[in-house]
């Protein structure tokens, strides 16, 4: 463990922050240049469900489209530089950590971006098509005055970002559980006994983070339960050597 003065810590923090900011600006500029393609990609779930139906995405404010593309570029840039942020955070705090603490932090910062991306991929390819199909079922084209969807460009992006962030954060569940187990705050046996409570909590979280339709809630709750069970298996592997070591010392 290395000891630094406050000024050295502050200088190091500024350098790390500057690197993150520089990376963000560069990636943001690239994303803004390709923002049309990125937005078209996000529209794919809706476009595939529409088939031959002509679908319009509108904007009702003069600056709405511009600021929507700015928001899209910023969000895309942030999701891309998550590993850079994680690396810079690790390099900043690692000199002040013990070896076992470094392993825990490295595990968290390595797995967190991966799980976030897994959640994003899952929601985009599996949840959004089902959710969009549900919402499109409210269209009534055969009525005297047809009811059709003409989504606003900003509202559509806000919903997509909301879902990606919700699933990305929810997929961090294994990290939280495993770290608590490593710190000996939560035991595997406790996780097994509290399964029913975990099921209820997962559905509550899903209800808060997802749109109000039941399909989206189940689409998040079920993966969370699978992640919970996976966490139990991993925690069991972590605890087994620890238990054997205690028994060996007692003998």
Swiss-Prot record:
Q: How does it sit in the membrane?
A: Multi-pass membrane protein
Keywords assigned by UniProt, alphabetized: Cell inner membrane, Cell membrane, Membrane, Protein transport, Translocation, Transmembrane, Transmembrane helix, Transport
Q: Kindly state one GO CC term assigned in the UniProt record.
A: TAT protein transport complex
Q: Name one GO biological process term.
A: intracellular protein transmembrane transport
Q: Which InterPro entries does its entry note?
A: Sec-indep_translocase_CS, TatC
**Where does it live in the cell?**
Cell inner membrane
What are the coiled-coil residue ranges?
Answer: none
Main location as per UniProt: membrane
Question: Which residue windows are transmembrane per the record?
Answer: 23-43, 73-93, 104-124, 159-179, 197-217, 218-238
Keyword match Transcription: no
The record, for Pfam families, names: TatC
Which Cys-Cys disulfides exist here?
none
Q: Does the keyword Transmembrane apply?
A: yes
The record's GO molecular-function terms, alphabetically, read:
proton motive force dependent protein transmembrane transporter activity
Its assembly, as annotated, is:
The Tat system comprises two distinct complexes: a TatABC complex, containing multiple copies of TatA, TatB and TatC subunits, and a separate TatA complex, containing only TatA subunits. Substrates initially bind to the TatABC complex, which probably triggers association of the separate TatA complex to form the active translocon.
Which NCBIfam families does the record match to this protein?
tatC
**What family does this chain come from, according to its entry?**
Belongs to the TatC family.
Cited function: Part of the twin-arginine translocation (Tat) system that transports large folded proteins containing a characteristic twin-arginine motif in their signal peptide across membranes. Together with TatB, TatC is part of a receptor directly interacting with Tat signal peptides.
Please report the name of this protein according to its UniProt entry.
Sec-independent protein translocase protein TatC
């Amino acid at each position: 463990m290395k000891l630094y003065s406050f000024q050295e810590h502050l200088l190091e923090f500024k350098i790390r922050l500057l690197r993150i900011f520089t990376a963000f600006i560069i990636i943001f500029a690239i994303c803004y240049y390709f923002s049309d393609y990125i937005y078209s990609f996000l529209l794919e779930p809706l476009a595939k469900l529409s088939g031959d139906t002509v679908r319009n995405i509108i904007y009702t404010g003069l600056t709405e489209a511009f600021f929507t593309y700015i928001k899209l570029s910023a969000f895309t840039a942030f999701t891309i530089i998550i590993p850079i942020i994680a690396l810079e955070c690790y390099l900043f705090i690692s000199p002040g950590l013990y070896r076992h603490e470094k392993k825990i932090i490295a595990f968290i910062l390595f797995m967190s971006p991966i799980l976030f991306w897994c959640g994003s991929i899952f929601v985009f390819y599996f949840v959004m098509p089902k959710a969009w199909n549900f919402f499109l079922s409210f269209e009534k084209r055969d009525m005297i005055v047809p009811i059709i969807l003409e989504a606003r460009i900003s509202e559509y992006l806000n919903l997509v970002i909301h879902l990606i962030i919700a699933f990305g954060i929810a997929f961090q569940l294994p990290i939280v559980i495993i770290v608590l187990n490593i710190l000996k705050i939560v035991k595997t046996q406790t996780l097994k006994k509290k399964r029913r409570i975990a099921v209820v909590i997962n559905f509550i979280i899903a209800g808060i983070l997802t749109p109000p339709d039941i399909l989206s809630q189940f689409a998040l709750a079920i993966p969370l339960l699978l992640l919970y069970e996976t966490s139990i298996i991993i925690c069991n592997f972590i605890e087994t050597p620890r238990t054997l070591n205690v028994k060996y010392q007692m003998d």
